[in-house]
């Protein structure tokens, strides 16, 4: 049984200590049920601009531009499987408002989008980390060669611009000796960044407050990139 949020609920999962630990945080606004949301739109996700360190090569590379589309598509695919929730995909949002991004500028723009698409809320997101695995599925030379994913998402009401739910995630896959449960859950292998992103979205959406999650048949997968 899913736990309903009666107060702003903060959910922290995974080991928090040590470099490369997995962190997941979701917050649900206590008044979300008052909005009676049954139809939402997934906006095209933004990609965080490179930091000075990334531009100079001192830090991990900035996420590639395509990572925004990949994460937005993953969220759409998984949310669209839920009962009791209709979801408008990012391409339809772009077609309706070509200039819109994940960072909506004003309430009037939100209301306009809501009227055009007949949605009560939008899901917007930003990709901060999207690093591909360097090496094979069976072994890496260095721990930092593992795939890494980090993103934040928000569900925003088009009526008043209030944030009704947020989700944040970061993970650099750790070796078997540090993350036995992760390997048991996802298989004894080092994941590609797309596989890690797929798992990350599943974990964040465990606490998504709208719709009912349908148990997928064994072997069902997300669409290929």
Name the predicted role of every residue range.
Residues 100, 140-142:
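Outer-membrane beta-barrel domain signature
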Residues 132-138:
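Extracytoplasmic/secreted cell-surface and envelope-processing proteins
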